[in-house]
């Protein structure tokens, strides 16, 4: 069982700084520029969970080619999270290939689950965008096109080994 938390983390990032997330996965490395100016609460949450090691060993449990790869659920079922929820932030960017956004179960239900866009897709602005890939699109391609079973679950899920955060 993963660590659970009673409440969202206090704001600890500096929205004026640049943050980079390096996701080491069993399929390769993805690097993303986080966007604290667009979504400070969401970036703060992702940075907190990454630094806690929350994502280590977590799989991409839902993959849809031409759409997205989704992970961040410690149970691997699509229904797990960190033990708390936090509010949505306004979405001003589009859901283009390589964007990172929060998965949710409705308004203001963000937790730990996120997705990476495999392709441009016209989603409603209900999923807070908090980052964009700067490298590793071939890793997204490999994950998104892997064979799946029921509920878009990969037959051989890719795991996140670690998420390292750097700031400048």
For the regions a protein language model found, what residue spans apply to each?
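Cyclophilin-like peptidyl-prolyl cis-trans isomerases
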Residues: 1-168
């Amino acid at each position: 069982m993963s660590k659970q938390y009673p409440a969202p983390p206090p704001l600890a990032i500096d929205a004026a700084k640049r943050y980079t997330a390096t996701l080491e996965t069993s399929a390769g490395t993805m690097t993303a520029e986080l966007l604290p100016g667009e979504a400070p609460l969401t970036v703060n949450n992702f940075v907190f969970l990454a630094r806690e090691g929350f994502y280590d060993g977590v799989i991409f449990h839902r993959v849809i080619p031409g759409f997205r790869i989704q992970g961040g659920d410690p149970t691997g079922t699509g229904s797990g999270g960190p033990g708390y929820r936090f509010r949505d932030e306004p979405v001003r960017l589009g859901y283009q290939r390589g964007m990172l956004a929060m998965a949710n179960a409705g308004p203001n239900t963000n937790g730990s689950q996120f997705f990476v866009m495999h392709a441009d897709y016209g989603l409603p602005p209900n999923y807070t965008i908090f980052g964009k890939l700067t490298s590793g699109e071939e890793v997204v391609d490999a994950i998104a096109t892997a064979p799946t079973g029921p509920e878009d679950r990969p037959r051989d899920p890719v795991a996140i080994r670690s998420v390292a955060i750097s700031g400048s």
